[in-house]
Every structure is written in C-alpha cells, then in structure tokens.
Swiss-Prot record:
Protein name: Aspartate--tRNA(Asp/Asn) ligase
Reactions the enzyme catalyzes: tRNA(Asx) + L-aspartate + ATP = L-aspartyl-tRNA(Asx) + AMP + diphosphate
Region called Aspartate, residue ranges: 198-201
PROSITE patterns found in the cross-reference section: AA_TRNA_LIGASE_II (PS50862)
NAD found in the keyword field: no
Site description Important for tRNA non-discrimination, residues in chain: H31
Pfam families membership: GAD (PF02938), tRNA-synt_2 (PF00152), tRNA_anti-codon (PF01336)
Keywords: Aminoacyl-tRNA synthetase, ATP-binding, Cytoplasm, Ligase, Nucleotide-binding, Protein biosynthesis
Protein purpose: Aspartyl-tRNA synthetase with relaxed tRNA specificity since it is able to aspartylate not only its cognate tRNA(Asp) but also tRNA(Asn). Reaction proceeds in two steps: L-aspartate is first activated by ATP to form Asp-AMP and then transferred to the acceptor end of tRNA(Asp/Asn).
SUBUNIT field: Homodimer.
Annotated PANTHER family: ASPARTATE--TRNA LIGASE, MITOCHONDRIAL, ASPARTYL/LYSYL-TRNA SYNTHETASE
GO biological process, alphabetically ordered: aspartyl-tRNA aminoacylation
Positions annotated to bind ATP: R220, D221, E222, Q229, E484, G536, I537, D538, R539
Amino acid sequence: MYRSHTCGELRPAHAGQEVTLAGWVHRRRDHGDLIFIDLRDRYGITQVVFNSAHPTAHEVAETVRSEYVLQVRGKVRIRPPEAVNPDLATGEIELEASEAQVLNPARTPPIYIAKEGGEDESVRLKYRYLDLRRERMQRNLILRHRVVKFIRDFLDAEGFLEIETPILIKSTPEGARDYLVPSRLHPGKFYALPQSPQQLKQLLMVAGYDKYFQIARCFRDEDQRADRQPEFTQLDMEMSFVDQDDVLDLIERMFTALCRTVVPHKHLPTPFRRLSYAEAMERYGSDKPDLRYGLELVNLSDLLIETPFQVFRNVLNSGGQVKGIRAPGCAHFSRKQIDELTDVVRAGGAKGLAWAVLPTDGGEVRSSFAKNLAPGEFAAIVERMQAEAGDLLLIVADQPAVVAASLDKLRRNLAERLQLADPNTLCFAWIVDFPLVEWNEDEQRWDAVHHPFTAPKDEDMHLLATDPGKVRAKAYDLILNGYEAGGGSIRIHRRDVQQQIFSLLGISEELAQAQFGHMLEAFEYGAPPHGGIAPGIDRLVMILADEPTIREVMAFPKTQQAVDLMTNAPSPVDERQLKELHIRIVMPE
C-alpha cells in the first residue's frame, strides 16, 4: 500500500496515528537537523517534518528536490499554536516522518508548480502535464467534473437517457468545415467527425427515445477565432413532444440548480430574462449582450432626419442609423481616452465616433459635432439619452449592422474601463424569435441563421415563399455574461416542410437526397414534434471558474493555430499509412 491517507485528509482527530502518505514535494525548507517538506497531491498539502532523530528518513529528505515523488511514513502530531497554518486544510497538524522513500526523482521543472509563474502560455501547453499539477488547474478540472456530474444526475432524475452517438459519421454541410477521416476499406470515401450530433439526435426522437442527452465531443475545422478549439464538448439534448417553453423551462431549472450547487457564492438573478432578437439588437447591438450592466444603445435617428449636419443626414438618407451610448460620469475622460474609444468603434467597422462632454461645473459643452446641429437638436439628444452633467455622450452614424457591431464593442470596452460587470454575478438570459434565414450578399442566396433543421414559427409560414427574411424561427439562445452559453430550436419534423426549407436555402432535391436522404425518409415514418439545445461545457465552466479562456478549463487544449504543443500534433504520417488509405499529399505551392 503506497498510502493510507491523502495529503489533504489529516486533521487533529488523527493525532497519534501512524499513517503513510505519498505525493510530490511541493516545497522543501532545510534547517539542518530539521527539514520541512510540504507534500502535495490533488487533495491538498501536508507538512512533513524530518528530524535527525530518524537519520534514515532525514537522509532521504536531504536528497529530495521539488517535484520528487515521495512516500513517507510517520506519526501525526498537533502543531504548536504559533505554527498553525490557516491557509491549509491540514494546517493544524504535521507528520513526523520515521521512514521515507523516493518513488521517483524529478528534473528541475521548466515551470513553477508551487506558484503561478510568468511563463508564456506556449510553455504551459508544451508541459501541460506539469501545468496541470498547479492548484488553479486542479481547481478548474474538479469544477468541470462537478458540473458534468450534476448535469448527469439532474437529467437522470428528469427521465433522460444518456445515449452515445457515432464519432465517424457522414459528411454534410452544416456550416464549418468537417474534419475528414479516410476509409481504408472503401478507397476514395471519407467519414467526418461530427460538428454536432444534430441529425443523429433527431433520429433518436424518430426512434421513440423522447428524452436524450449526451456529453458530446464535437469537431470543427474552422479558423481559430479568439477563443475557439478544434474539438470541444457540449451538453447535447433533445426532447419529443415539447414546445419552446418546455425546453426553456427545463434548462432554466437545471442551470439555476447547477449554479446554486457548484458556485453558491455567486449571485444568480432569476427568472432568466427573455429578449427577442430584435430587442437585443436594438438595445445592445448584440444577440449575446452582457446584462450585468446598462449602457444601452439609444436610437437618435428620428431626431436628426432634417439635421444640417451632413455626416448624420447622409447616413440617414442612405438607410442608416444614428445611435449613441451615455457613459455616466465620464466627462473627465481625456482626449487620448476618447481617441482610444474611437479606435474601438473603428474596429467594429464605424468610420468615426461623435462625442460630447457635459461638464459638471455648468460650463460650455465640449463636442466634436454639436456646433453643426440645428438649434434644439443637441438638447433633444441630451433629453433622449437622459444625460446629466458629468456624462460623456458617444454616437455612431452608419448602416445598422455597423452601428450594432461598433457600439457593442464600445459598450463592452466601457464596461471594462468602468468595472461595471460584477464577476460574482451570473446573468443568464434567453434570446428568442431569431430570423430563420439571412441574405448572403456575396453568394446571392439565403443562409440558415442557425441550421437547416430549425422550424419556422407557425404564424410566419405564409411568408416563406414571399418574404423569407421576415420569417422568425423557433430558435433560442441561452446567453451568460456576454457569451452564448448554448443554442437550440424546435426542429422541423415533416418532410414537406424540410424540403421547402432546403429549397429556400438553394439545396436542390438531388443534393438534399444525397446529403440528407436518411433524415427525409425518417420523417415519413412518424417523426414526433421535437426540439433541443446544446450548451457548451467548456464555455460554461470557464465563466463559472472566472477564467479568461476555455483553454484554462480543458485538460489538453490546442493553440489558436490548432496545434498540440505537447505531442506536436498534427504531424506527418508514414508513407505506408498513406498508401494503405490510397492518399497522396500534394503540398500547396
């Protein structure tokens, strides 16, 4: 037996007992006759005292260094009051070692384990097995385990079945590029790794498994924007005989119970707010707004239709908008800070930023545009924005999509500068009534906003043939603190409607049959009404753990370039393997 207890287990009640511990040397302090070693495992740290009265064990302690794997036997004793360490769960006791054995020595690690170092993330990823020894990473992975376990237990109690779906599936166009797997047995043919189990879970509904879930691994060969991974984990769910409210109510109950269990110290406003897509875009410029703070967008367009200021007027005459944000108490912002905010909106596509400072002393307004307005227009803007002395008004004039994107960026930037987002608040909300399709200007066709299996709202069905852009979907997104936490919809369950949507999306009958024939045929054998959702596990745990990226809550993530620095994947393969697969590599010139 290597150990009788873990390094986080011993308490004053164990005093006088002979125990055996095994773990890693966290810290070592040599005081000559006395050597103190903090022995660590994932359960905690225990201070071990090596006294020269036990010379064999003391000699072992003289040789060990950080991260040696050590087994120690000895007697538990109470620490003197002045030596109690309140930062350790085991801080009231220590182990007086009588025997010790080095189970494995260790080279000097390239990263500090005992404390957070300033090393580059690439070093952490290359030596991830060392990085994972750190308290922060252990805490994150334990939290992840608790989240997944809670979900499994909750859904089991709700009558759901956890059913695994295949990893090797048919390649179908669902948005991002598929990861392809060549078939040795069928030369020239390929499997795909699933971007999601979307079609398979719908087929499970046809099969009669009315409550399905899976902790699903998903794969997308897309350009790695910001904080994405080529492989990720989602809670995949589907239910039969449900409408939108049924799905939303279940998920809200589950996430409320989850958060109150695993992060009880966080504030969780309930019930979750519900915003239509149109309302979210109008008020926040985003379909995933952070609702922990205000800074809402204010539409000024109707006040400026006749304005002599040509910048605003030209935008409005071309179908654009003029919108602004009131930054309360920010009249003290310097010109340099305002220039930085201008760069923020330019990153969102805006050509510039109009601004006005309302001084606190009742003095003259400073503004980049007020002098160009007609009498009364600036006063109308101040009134509409409910501005007060000491406020900073920030305005963008452009096409609606640019106004939304630029003011969304500005809103988030201001919130960060002003520290408006409480890190201990979890602000969930539902975004509903998404458009079913959006026009792709480059390819001159309609694209599905979510995916082609999303059902249109019944009351909008008559618009499919005449005005598809106005058709709303039975789709919903769960948002959390400015992130999309999960997306779902009520699905199409009739072949004729599914074919109508395929046709609208420019998918011919021949292509639909080739790509989705199995789905269309299944719908002819009594497919029930059904719907589901797929919250992302990585993103959820990231937010609950207060981490900046999903890489911090994944055991072995890849870089933004989709490279595994630890194993050097992807890597070349043996020519013999390629030959067996009937594949020849043609490198780009």
